[in-house]
Regions:
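Glycine-rich phosphate/adenosyl-contacting loop at the front of the ribokinase-like
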Residues: 4-71, 75-89
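Alpha-helical segments flanking ligand/cofactor-binding loops in enzyme cores
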Residues: 56, 81-82, 158, 162, ...
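Active-site-proximal loop->helix
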Residues: 75-87, 107-109, 114, 118, ...
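Conserved phosphate/ATP/ADP-binding segment of small-molecule kinases
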Residues: 161-220
């Protein structure tokens, strides 16, 4: 795992409650067809997951960032801690579960076309319990901004959003990968950051241009 050099400082306490997975990326000249084995050109292992990626990006931009995620007590979990320690980031709020494995993303990249195929195995991030969330309630309540995604189980996501909303914390939702949230929960979100596909899935309104349609503005 490698880290980038340099960061700036800025104010505001940011809590990212989301996923960490280890990215396992293989590159080759073509994808195998079902039942076929092909030789690849290169392999890379590194930190990933939408929650982790956004936490690292915000930290490198100068934010006061704490990531809350769940990992297994395994080699991938230890590698994650090593990476975050090298970044200078806080890992004290991470949840460990020896009964679960750390999540992983299996990524194949076609070097000729640039296309990829990805299978995400969320592992421990799919097993965040109500007790896990309650243990982080004070941390969430004291944040200025809560950033969440949809790579954790929906029950935990809704619990986290409700705590933040009731505490007056600004909630930003990156709705990826899209899962159904009750309208009541969407009303507790201050900012939603969908791409075109995610916006259409959430609203039922097809994206025909990149200017925000009136119907979508009304929804959000």
């Amino acid at each position: 795992f490698k880290r980038a050099k340099g960061r700036i400082q800025m104010g505001g306490r940011i809590v990212v409650f989301g996923s960490y997975v280890t990215d396992l990326t293989g590159r080759g000249t073509r994808f195998p067809v079902p039942g076929e084995t092909v030789l690849g050109a290169s392999f890379q292992m590194g930190p990933g997951g939408k929650g982790s990626n956004q936490a690292v990006a915000a930290f490198r931009a100068g934010g006061d960032v704490t990531l809350v995620t769940k990992l297994g007590r395994d080699a991938f979990g230890r590698a994650a801690r090593d990476f975050y320690t090298a970044e200078g980031m806080n890992t004290g709020e991470w949840i460990e579960d020896e009964t679960c494995e750390t999540g992983a993303a299996l990524i194949m990249v076609n070097q000729q076309s640039g296309q990829n195929m990805i299978m995400v195995l969320n592992g421990a991030c799919s097993h965040i319990t109500p007790e896990d969330v309650r243990a982080k309630q004070t941390l969430i309540e004291q944040a200025d901004v809560l950033l969440v995604q949809m790579e954790i189980n929906v029950g935990a996501l809704e619990h986290v959003i409700r705590i933040a909303h009731e505490s007056g914390v600004r909630v930003i939702l990156n709705p990826a990968p899209v899962q159904k949230l009750a309208d009541e929960m969407m009303a507790m979100v201050d900012t939603v950051t969908p791409n075109e596909t995610e916006a259409a899935a959430l609203t039922g309104v097809e994206v025909v241009d990149l200017n925000p349609p009136t119907a979508r503005r009304r929804y959000f």
